[in-house]
């Protein structure tokens, strides 16, 4: 668990006391500042969205000594988890089935290929090159391949990872995923400057199939326009929804370290693995699809879209600010060099190898 999660558990979970309310007010105020700044001309010129500015502001606050007195662990966890998931669900109001259909089969095949390649290479590189335990290598690979910290926390029980291994894997996701927020818009601008014809939706699939966290995907794709952002979210949801079957596969292929029942009971192990996968299922992804279905059927009036978008952006900005406060560079470096190096190699593989997979699938699809 991260430091914030440990503090949150020690404090008894979510308690709306005076400090919590003050922290929520500060969180909302900083997110509001990021939203206002993100709407200015200079931010648009620099390609900085409200979400990018929110995480930058959070990173700045996170390095201020004593900020935990106001931003409690409960406040951070509420923003990182509850508000983030609610924001992802509301994002469905921006999507329609027609947009999903327009991505075609490649929009599903690409993220699944990237996921499989990252899991396999991550487990091999982590154990053979960097000497990590099998459980830690799988954790780092899952965080990079599926959906960031949520995947790490879901996979940890399946491989019986220690709290330290879990915390290090989450730290790597935060570090390289945050770097990706700034890298992908720059890569898109570089491609445009070089005269490479890349459709925004195709680049959105590239972002969604290779970047770690859901919030990071949205933040990286937003500056590129609605087509890129929507495609990125749909592509990312394919990876998120793959978490449940991945947990079953991991539990069944790692019996020595994973979810084991009675000795020799393969059927019992499978039942337990399936139960864990069901409990760890990212239901917010299903919620996003449900809202997208409502929007496709015209159940969401056009006059509601603007306020829903504003509320959604506010929730996501709060989540990005909270994630930023946890991106404390000295703390990340103390978490361990070898796991971070492994995560760095996987990140390079996602950026370069993911681009090759995206290009290859689209070439084969004609």
UniProtKB/Swiss-Prot annotation:
Family membership noted in the UniProt record: Belongs to the UPF0324 family.
InterPro entries linked to this entry: UPF0324_pro, UPF0324_YeiH-like
Compartments, as annotated in UniProt: Cell membrane
Keyword Membrane: yes
Keyword annotations from UniProtKB, A to Z: Cell membrane, Membrane, Transmembrane, Transmembrane helix
TM segment ranges: 21-43, 103-125, 137-159, 169-191, 198-220, 240-262, 283-305, 343-365
Organism of derivation: Ralstonia nicotianae (strain ATCC BAA-1114 / GMI1000)
Keyword Repeat in record: no
PANTHER family: INNER MEMBRANE PROTEIN YEIH-RELATED, UPF0324 INNER MEMBRANE PROTEIN YEIH
Source taxonomy: Bacteria, Pseudomonadati, Pseudomonadota, Betaproteobacteria, Burkholderiales
GO CC annotations on file: plasma membrane
UniProt cross-references to Pfam families, sorted A to Z: Cons_hypoth698
Topological relation to the membrane, as annotated: Multi-pass membrane protein
Identification of the protein by name: UPF0324 membrane protein RSc1111
